[in-house]
Amino acid sequence: MKAYQRQFIEFALEKGVLKFGEFTLKSGRVSPYFFNAGLFNTGRDLARLGRFYAEALVDAGIDYDVLFGPAYKGIPIATTTAVALADHHDIDMPYCFNRKEVKTHGEGGSLVGSDLEGRIMLVDDVITAGTAIRESMEIIKANGADLAGVLVAIDRQEKGKGELSAIQEVERDFGCAVISIVSLGDVVTYLSEQDGMDAHLAAVKSYRAEYGV
């Protein structure tokens, strides 16, 4: 685990974005942890979040031309990532996001920002079922662009309905890399390094043994 990944886990814990306990997911599974990126909800939080996304992008070394943030959660993520790339890595990357509702006046259309062209890096908070990615793919294809990759905050490394995780299904279906700032494996490593986290570590390991990929 790299320094920025450890710092991201600490940041998520500090802000209550990453919590340990018992949480019933939409799937009905009872998870020993929960990740709610919506709690990164101040200007300072968003600025820090962008730096972690930018760090993960630079670390991954994937070639792309435009950042795309799917509405709604992806919009501030794409924006802050673009700012962080410019401020901290001297990479001036165009960004774009979509509207859920097509605008019929003014500039019109469903896209805001840069043209959606070339190789697209999609940024979002998490991939749960891959639905948002599939919807975004329709937009990307309709503009004649290609999906270069997907970046999310955390990879739960958890089976979906079959044997693959939602992220593995996206990689299989769209032939692109899906990268994350951290994975569940990184969270396990972090917990194992902390004093007083044995109960949470045991619960996460047990959950991973049952549902992990």
Curated annotation (Swiss-Prot):
GO terms for cellular component: cytoplasm. Its cofactor is Mg(2+). The keyword Glycosyltransferase applies. It catalyses: orotidine 5'-phosphate + diphosphate = orotate + 5-phospho-alpha-D-ribose 1-diphosphate. 5-phospho-alpha-D-ribose 1-diphosphate binds at residues 26, 72-73, 99-100, 103, 105, 124-132. One of its GO terms (molecular function) is orotate phosphoribosyltransferase activity. Its EC number is 2.4.2.10. Pathway: Pyrimidine metabolism; UMP biosynthesis via de novo pathway; UMP from orotate: step 1/2. One of its GO terms (biological process) is pyrimidine ribonucleoside biosynthetic process. InterPro entries: OPRT, Or_phspho_trans_dom, PRibTrfase_dom, PRTase-like. Orotate binds at residues 34-35, 128, 156. Keywords: Glycosyltransferase, Magnesium, Pyrimidine biosynthesis, Transferase. Belongs to the purine/pyrimidine phosphoribosyltransferase family. PyrE subfamily. Catalyzes the transfer of a ribosyl phosphate group from 5-phosphoribose 1-diphosphate to orotate, leading to the formation of orotidine monophosphate (OMP). HAMAP family: PyrE. Homodimer. This is Orotate phosphoribosyltransferase. It comes from Photobacterium profundum (strain SS9).
